[in-house]
């Protein structure tokens, strides 16, 4: 699909966001192993989360969906059914990695998990190695580093693991596996990724504690169960960031995103934009589904360059492509570092972002773990490619709203992975 964009005169609107992708995945996966039924409202109906539903259905879990409301009839901790076919995770790394952890402790189950070409190219040793240390029997291409992954459910034990990278997917895979283990799992090191799994497990009755950078989970005994958790999924801050950047960069804009998840592990993009000088108001703050939420309004702003690094990176890793676009339009230099994780996303997002920004007229230098963006650029229209990466597709769409001339995007359908309504919203806010 090809979309062509030119900058509108104004941007105005109130945007009801799709449900958060991370929470939507976890709401289905965790309720699948609870005992009883749960209702999940504002579920993200993007392709990734639908892959999660299809996989748990293949494991014998009843799931019903009506528009953006999903009912999950949990099978219980040890009642998943062996799938009769390969589990296709599509483009979803979250589905593949969390399901691998969940199935690793399902004694007697044999499962093969795969995905599309992009997912099959992404490294999996980051989950395979620590799961094997807990007793999991796993294999895959490239000595277990690439999907398809083969899982033979086994008897797992507890233990301690020091996380070398801040990855919510790795952390969550280990916590899900530990539910079926014998003994407490202790996680230390880079536990500073998204904490939705920890929050949901605690709400469902699991014995889990978080003390600074140390997480401990003691598995329930065989007579215990996880309680089903009904919730309304808050709006996805990763999706909201595209509108925040559009409003900050456009010379005549005011956009409000409602019901945004304001979990501190997810507000890195807000913090970065504030540091760059964006005019941001947060109102109507409240708690929904165990997560802090609020309404965020961003207006036209004069941005300046900053350094994005260190502990901030895990809190905005998915938003870095569009933040790089903001940096290209800001005054002064922006340095992004400690973000080597970008190289193993749906694309090598360092290479693809640098190439796209350069085509738009920005001056950008790639580094091994990030990029240096000169800033001050008056972006021009260009012909750009999404490479099948949903974050890139939306980043280049925003570039088309703020650059001079016409921008043409190839592969525009990639937005369906996480934001199926993106193009409809974009049309509505243009004036």
Swiss-Prot record:
Keywords assigned: Amino-acid biosynthesis, Aromatic amino acid biosynthesis, Cytoplasm, Transferase
Organism encoding this protein: Roseiflexus castenholzii (strain DSM 13941 / HLO8)
Cysteines engaged in disulfide bonds, as pairs: none
List of residues binding phosphoenolpyruvate: 21, 93, 122, 169, 349, 391
Domain of life: Bacteria
Locations listed in the record: Cytoplasm
Chemical reaction(s) catalysed: 3-phosphoshikimate + phosphoenolpyruvate = 5-O-(1-carboxyvinyl)-3-phosphoshikimate + phosphate
Ligand binding (3-phosphoshikimate): 21-22, 26, 167, 169, 318, 345
Family listed: Belongs to the EPSP synthase family.
Descriptive protein name: 3-phosphoshikimate 1-carboxyvinyltransferase
Involved pathway(s): Metabolic intermediate biosynthesis; chorismate biosynthesis; chorismate from D-erythrose 4-phosphate and phosphoenolpyruvate: step 6/7
């Amino acid at each position: 699909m090809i979309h062509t964009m030119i900058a509108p005169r104004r941007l105005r609107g109130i945007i009801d966001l799709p449900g958060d992708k991370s929470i939507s995945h976890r709401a289905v996966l965790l309720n699948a192993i609870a005992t009883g039924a749960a209702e999940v409202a504002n579920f993200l109906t993007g392709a990734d989360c639908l892959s999660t539903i299809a996989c748990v259905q293949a494991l014998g879990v009843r799931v019903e969906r009506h528009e953006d409301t999903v009912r999950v009839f949990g099978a219980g901790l040890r009642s998943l059914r062996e799938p009769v076919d390969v589990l296709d995770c599509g483009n979803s790394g979250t589905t593949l990695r969390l399901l691998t952890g969940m199935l690793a402790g399902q004694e007697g189950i044999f499962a093969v998990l795969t995905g599309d070409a992009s997912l099959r190219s992404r490294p999996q040793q980051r989950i395979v190695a620590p799961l094997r240390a807990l007793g999991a029997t796993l294999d895959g291409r490239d000595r277990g580093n690439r999907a398809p992954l083969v899982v033979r459910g086994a008897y797992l034990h507890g233990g301690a693991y020091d996380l070398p990278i801040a990855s919510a997917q790795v952390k969550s895979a280990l916590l899900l596996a530990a539910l079926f283990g014998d003994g407490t799992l202790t996680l230390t090191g880079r536990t500073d990724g998204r904490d939705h799994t920890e929050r949901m497990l605690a709400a469902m009755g699991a014995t889990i504690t978080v003390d600074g950078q140390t997480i401990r989970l003691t598995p329930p005994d065989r007579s215990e169960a996880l309680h089903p958790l009904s919730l309304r999924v808050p709006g996805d801050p990763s999706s909201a960031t595209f509108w925040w950047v559009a409003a900050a960069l456009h010379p005549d804009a005011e956009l409000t995103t409602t019901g945004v998840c304001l979990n501190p592990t997810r507000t890195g993009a807000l913090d970065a934009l504030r540091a760059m000088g964006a005019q941001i108001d947060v109102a109507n703050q409240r708690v929904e589904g165990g997560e802090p939420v609020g309404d965020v309004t961003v207006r036209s702003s004069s941005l300046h360059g900053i350094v994005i690094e260190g502990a901030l990176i895990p809190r905005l890793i998915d938003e870095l492509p569009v933040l790089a676009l903001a940096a290209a339009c800001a005054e002064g230099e922006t340095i992004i570092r400690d973000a080597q994780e970008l190289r193993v996303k749906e694309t090598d997002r360092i290479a693809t972002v640098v190439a796209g920004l350069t085509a738009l007229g920005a001056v950008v230098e790639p580094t091994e773990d990030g990029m240096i963006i000169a800033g001050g650029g008056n972006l021009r229209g260009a012909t750009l490619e999404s490479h099948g990466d949903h974050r890139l597709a939306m980043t280049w769409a925003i570039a088309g709203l703020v650059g001079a001339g016409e921008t043409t995007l190839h592969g525009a359908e990639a937005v369906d992975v996480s934001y199926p309504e993106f193009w409809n919203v974009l049309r509505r806010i243009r004036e």
